[in-house]
From Swiss-Prot:
Part of the 50S ribosomal subunit. The gene is rplO. HAMAP family: Ribosomal_uL15. Residues 1-47 are annotated as: Disordered. This is Large ribosomal subunit protein uL15.
Length: 148
């Protein structure tokens, strides 16, 4: 039974675990300069992050950020008339709640209808905005749009 390899018999391969070199502990073993060379900034302390040795640093070479983010910007969810024709082929009155129920838009955001696609049925849209092309296509098919 002595030939079976057991956990306590395992040891790392020779040379796999090297001791780290402790510097600055006497002249005989990397003492004095501790591998940092003789004089200069990098011997005495670290250079700050982003320092490029006197060259104009990258963060100063790049232009400043311009403009601002408007906190009052209104983000509309868009629905094309092709999607309306697919979801409501029979036409009729459509509200934002109907679009949410069908999964076309998410709740809590304003909706805008855009004019990509064709309209065959008459839609009465309530509570949505519409682009000029969408408005003309819906009205040409006998529908109407109210934004209130």
């Amino acid at each position: 039974m002595a030939d079976i390899l057991q956990m306590h018999d395992l040891k790392p391969a020779p040379g796999a675990n090297k001791d780290r070199i402790r510097v600055g502990r006497g002249e005989g073993s990397k003492g004095k300069t501790s591998g940092r060379g003789d004089k200069g900034t990098k011997k005495r302390y670290q250079v700050r992050p982003g320092f490029e040795g006197g060259q104009l640093p990258l963060y100063m070479r790049l232009p400043k950020l311009r403009g601002f983010k408007n906190p009052f910007k209104k983000e509309y969810q868009v629905v094309n008339v092709a999607v309306l024709a697919e979801l409501f082929p029979q036409g009729g009155e459509i509200t934002v709640a109907d679009l949410v129920a069908k999964g076309a838009v998410r709740n809590g955001f304003p909706v805008k209808v855009l004019g990509d696609g064709e309209v065959s049925a008459a839609y009465t849209l309530k509570g949505v905005k519409a682009s000029a092309s969408a408005k003309s296509k819906i009205e040409a098919a006998g529908g109407s749009i109210s934004e209130d």
